[in-house]
Amino acid sequence: MLTNSLNVARVADAVIDWSLDRNKAMGTETWGISPVVAETNDMYLNDIRGRHVNREHVFLAIDSAKGGPVEEGAVGGGTGMICYDFKGGIGTASRKLPDKLGGYTVGILAQTNFGWRPQLVIDGVPIGRELEQYKPVRRKTVNPPSVIATHPSTPQQKNAAPLRTRLATPQNSRVTDSGSVIVGLATDAPCSTRILTRLAQRAQNGLARTGSHTGNTSGDFVISFSTPRRKKHFADALTYPAEQIIEQGDLINYLFWAVVEATEEAVLNSLFKAETMIGRDDRIVPGLPIEETVALMNQYGRKQVHLP
């Protein structure tokens, strides 16, 4: 489960309740559950002290889980998150290996809440530096339309301070590289604990491709798991056969590659799917301006980029 920093205990408690409600033998005939709950801090936009996540929210999240496309952007635990000073949240992506290498799939889900605007890179293009005027602000200080709609080529009003100057003052903007990111890594490749650790380490390369340098105090976690290696709840034999991929040749390198690419894309999807949000104390975090971003990508020679 993913949530914010001050709701970890509440979510974990609700996961235990949900499990006990659906398994009457748990805690009497068999052991209990150890919930896994990860968090990032959304205090800039959210009234985090209110601890608004409750038992019903957790039950609904578990009961509504299903296959198919995953909702992205400002949803679930990602509702109040900020990525590279744009609105962030939940992003997903996956890669499938060639059939000759097993046809395995690597899936990534990221809850993005990290990075500083000048760091953002998309396909090698310094998007963050080009769009640095789109700063998180307090609505009482700066008029929202000027934040959301102003383009680098838009003429400034007569006698008005440049937008970058007005938005870069400490009382108006977030100017530090702080935050966290949670990456969930799933694969149907049969992996040992060692291999899963190696895959998790490569997720950091995917974050780096978007511009992250893992700032001081940034809590970056990767939780990796492999789906085919399942054990029976109660063992009926002293041993059991277990397959796992070998750590040599093309397969392991293709898995590394898949992790890096999918992690990078998941971060970018969290940005492209999130929209401008007004949070507590009239704070505004702008969504990534997609049209301007696409124009910049084309300007830098990424001619294949187009709006759907």
Regions found by a protein language model. Name each.
Residues 1-308:
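Alpha/propeptide regions of enzymes that mature by internal proteolysis
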